[in-house]
Amino acid sequence: MEYNFREIEKKWQKIWVDNHTYQVNEDASKQKFYVLNMFPYPSGAGLHVGHPLGYIASDIYARYKRLQGFNVLNPMGYDAYGLPAEQYAIQTGQHPAITTVNNINRYREQLDKIGFSFDWNREIRTCDPEYYHWTQWAFIKMFNSYYCNDEKQARPIEELIEAFSTNGTQGMNVACGEEMDFTADEWNAKSEKEQQEILMNYRIAYLGNTMVNWCPALGTVLANDEVVDGVSERGGYPVIQKVMRQWCLRVSAYAQRLLDGLETVEWTDSLKETQRNWIGRSEGAEMNFKVKDSDIEFTIFTTRADTVFGVTFMVLAPESELVAKLTTPEQKAEVDAYLDRTKKRTERERIADRSVSGVFSGSYAINPLTNEPIPVWISDYVLAGYGTGAIMAVPAHDSRDYAFAKHFNLEIRPLIEGCDVSEESFDAKEGIMMNSPRPGAPEGGLVLNGLTVKEAIAKTKEYIKATGLGRVKVNFRLRDAIFSRQRYWGEPFPVYYKDGMPYMIDESCLPLELPEVAKFLPTETGEPPLGHATKWAWDTVNKCVTDNENIDNITIFPLELNTMPGFAGSSAYYLRYMDPRNHEALVSPAVDQYWKNVDLYVGGTEHATGHLIYSRFWNKFLHDWGISVAEEPFQKLVNQGMIQGRSNFVYRIKDTNTFVSLNLKDQYEVTPIHVDVNIVSNDILDLEAFKAWRPEYETAEFILEDGKYICGWAVEKMSKSMFNVVNPDMIVEKYGADTLRMYEMFLGPVEQSKPWDTNGIDGVHRFIKKFWSLFYDRNGEYLVKDEPATKEELKALHKLIKKVTGDIEQFSYNTSVSAFMICVNELSSLKCNKKEVLEQLIVVLAPFAPHVCEELWDTLGSTTSVCDAQWPAFNEQYLVEDTVNYTISFNGKARFNMEFPANAASDAIQATVLADERSLKWTEGKTPKKVIVVPKKIVNIVI
């Protein structure tokens, strides 16, 4: 019987669906294992061969763990909200819900063809109201919570309200936007609106004025990673910096826990370090500086309190509220022009760009230790979101301050003995202090001269704390997350507005569903697209959505017009997979206790500072409320590399429609042109297909070599514009899903990026055919016999089992594929057809090539799926070599080799070697001085 992969794969994909083969339920008798891929955004282009790489890798592992007896959860769903669907809707008028469903259906069709062991019973879509019910529910929880620094967890906001009404802010140690000070009487005297405004300073989900990346053309706020070189990643539209009132999540409250949690997870060191740097913990001090001839005072944060004597200027972030207060009338025009320029640069660009720019505010601050006046400048190298948005500049000991001082000819005052700051700053935290204070300064106060830097830092902190000039503080670079977007296609906020303040709708009324709108663009008055909705008001009496015309601001109020960002739906989806049809809770306690968290998470490193931070924060918040038993959502993380496109080029002779083959192109002046890789095979162009590809090539002529047109090639990002996108459907149709699965793994280590190159796919396909031929001959006769295996056959098998078991644990799938090829070659040479061997071979190969293995497993007479078999253990006794090859050397030079039984004694080996006629030749009749036998390696005869 011939290997007919089309029939086999279609047959088993249907059987898996009909028999619910991959459906899983909680089973207390089995140890659980939760495998998860970062779920895809269903774009209109569908999958290309790069997308399934991580899915295949995790699917192999999921199948392997099931064969080991684990109860494996391996779900899949869709991150279905997003900007592309909305942009398409704007262009075509087609509702995003329709295009999203169409795209999902296309993805599902493609995924099914590849043969994944997903439990589709648990499928989720973030745009499904049944799903975003729980996203809205979590948001309400966050709104109604504050973070207690003493207990290191979220607590109900009612506890804070009660504390304020009893003690005011006295004794409070809670996460907040700004520190407030009021008594219980002052709190109780405030109106409801005033109290709500104060509580916004403490809520975990809150409204705040933040600097955002605003894209006027798209009409929305963009995340930093959605902006490239000052324009939107999607569409290339200009982006400016703008202060807007936005919903935010107080992620910063969890900064230390996010750091600590990294010690408990199995992630790569590089990814952990990326998150540590993003969170950016720094220990330092806050110091207060007064403004000269003013009542204004502002605070700076510094990790080098010891350098306060070296401050020669102050710098404010352009977004700082202090800019307007400190800019003098004489400087206003210059400052306004500078602010206008900086608003076009994103924060990320400002961090990366080392060019110097700035403007003098016209004001001076007073150094609290020396009473010297210090000029206050404005520059975009200072960020509003880090520290206080103001810095004391010490150019002698900070490289960016140094560059600024050099550019604007400001004083540079060194504080470390012997340091040379003529060419660059001295940033090292080492040396002996000087100029602290400078010679001739008034006596009294803080003196650091003669101390080491470490001693000086400690002494300065103690001094400012004792004198009230500041305080010791730990600071984090991590910002609160902006959580609102001015778009249509996203989760609606369960929020209505009363007297300008936000209130939550009752949890019992969830989900609040996305309304229909006439247009997906902002309104003419600049409101988000939900401003077009005519039925978008909340009736607090009847607890339902009602027409806008009914708004009376007594019992019926306007609903929030913003929607949630893309990361809202992906922040807790792993929990919903555990219990996707539960209408009463995100996940039931019993189910949560069973699955706990994700044992293996597979996805790209590009999510290191986005999704992977937000999910960890979200999970820790839910953990505080007793909803997620595990504090960390993803125990082990594997980052798959990218499959790059292998582009092909044709070479057109300038000013002609003639194309010259690769190795002849240097004889002409040519222009390289990308050509569709689907009309190229092994770098040889299909000439007729090329002519039919585009009208302008219909009359093309060719200069060939040996009758063929050979294309050039390059490894580039896989994209439609380079015509190097390879559709997996084409590979599945031509070679089968099992070949695709094994070939993607064969390309190289999972974690590394590698080029897609079909030049080697035939070899993998031939391997599967050769594997098939162990069971059937060319005439279709079944070969398998129930006879004892030979020692050589068992050795080949157990060598494979040991190798593949270790490889799977290490995700070294490429070497596993090589091992399969070697083993099948060995068994073919041995003409092995023993059921004892082939049965175990099927099980070991099944995670990689499930369709063909199911078919052959069935032919062995099994009544269950190969998925329910048992992973074989390798037996070391079969791996012991019967004979050992010894190198025979004379005076250290290798001359020939001899085989000996593995258990041969040294005396016997020595006698046999000396009696060999080749030894007699090399000894020339002389008696050896010494014979050294190194067991299982070498015999060295010293003459």
Swiss-Prot record:
ATP binds at K720. One of its GO terms (molecular function) is aminoacyl-tRNA deacylase activity. Keywords: Aminoacyl-tRNA synthetase, ATP-binding, Cytoplasm, Ligase, Nucleotide-binding, Protein biosynthesis. Disulfide bonds: none annotated. Transmembrane segments: none annotated. One of its GO terms (cellular component) is cytosol. It is an enzyme of class 6 (ligase). Coiled coil: none annotated. It catalyses: tRNA(Leu) + L-leucine + ATP = L-leucyl-tRNA(Leu) + AMP + diphosphate. Its main location: cytoplasm. The keyword Cytoplasm applies. PROSITE patterns: AA_TRNA_LIGASE_I (PS00178). GO terms for biological process: leucyl-tRNA aminoacylation. The keyword Cell division does not apply. A motif ('HIGH' region) lies at residues 40-51. Belongs to the class-I aminoacyl-tRNA synthetase family. This is Leucine--tRNA ligase. It comes from Bacteroides fragilis (strain ATCC 25285 / DSM 2151 / CCUG 4856 / JCM 11019 / LMG 10263 / NCTC 9343 / Onslow / VPI 2553 / EN-2). The lineage of its organism: Bacteria, Pseudomonadati, Bacteroidota, Bacteroidia, Bacteroidales.
